[in-house]
Amino acid sequence: MPIFSALRLLFTMINYNNKVFVPLSNSENGEVDLSMRFVYQQTGNIVTSTYSGGRIRAGHLIALVDEQGNLDMRYHQVNDKGEITTGICKSTPEQLPNGKIRMHEKWQWTSGDQSEGESLLEEL
């Protein structure tokens, strides 16, 4: 990728750094609790977060963000049963009238039953 294109990518994408997201809804087969908080960190086009709460004792996500702010994510976590669970997620941002971001997520477990689900997160 030419340097100009790489710089343009960095300046046009959504900056998720230090944004805090809370779950609004989650599919029944998910482990995310509605009381959890996700604090995103971003360096370049890489987004990360550590999280815990509810049924999750410890979790980590890593994602690549594209020019439209979409996240291509992988996550792994330890649940309250002591199991390591893993998955993939595609997150699509929606800009709200108040300037905040709502994330529409479609995910799939890559461990266990391989089931799919959807979540909705919103920036605090």
Regions found by a protein language model. Name each.
Residues 13-32, 103-109:
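Tryptophan-anchored aromatic micro-motifs
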